[in-house]
Amino acid sequence: MQDFPDYVGYYAIKKYRYPGTPAANENNRNLLLFRDPSVDGLKTGHTDAAGFCLIATAKREAPGVGQRRLLSIVLGASSENARATESQKLLNWGYTAFDAIKLFDANQAVVTPNVWKGRGSQVKLGRMAPIVVAVPAGAGGRIQTQVARPEPLVAPLNRGQAVGALKVTLDQKPLVVVPLLVLDT
């Protein structure tokens, strides 16, 4: 989805009529497309060995974050309806049991350390995209962040250059380590 965003819309097509054929439509086998407006794909499958399978993806509004995408994967279901029902349960659980927390906006300085031998005396470090983490619902207040970076910072530094990292923890357990990039020079 990130590598080929131009194709994402194809997975949400509910019905398709092959050009040059009679007026019969081919329905998408992902039943969630017909049940939940937040679902926009992705892949169904069935074999005797694997049963009915579905990778479903949905986008819903997340307070303070914007659109939040989740994926569910169901393997070995007994029917098309069962795979859709179980996928819907997983998506609903994911959206209610976990909060998306935006720690920093795109291009927001996480830290502004001093820099030696540069045009300016300081440089902003952050990310070009927002820094967002998922945590159990209600746990956002227990997130901690720590910046690790080399000392001292010496020019030249280039925009987009990785200079250190932001370590994010929840209850002293690591969640993610995000490389910090030079936002300006």
Q: Where are the language model's segments positioned?
A:
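Domain-terminus/edge residues, biased toward the C-terminal soluble/receptor-binding domains
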Residues: 1-185
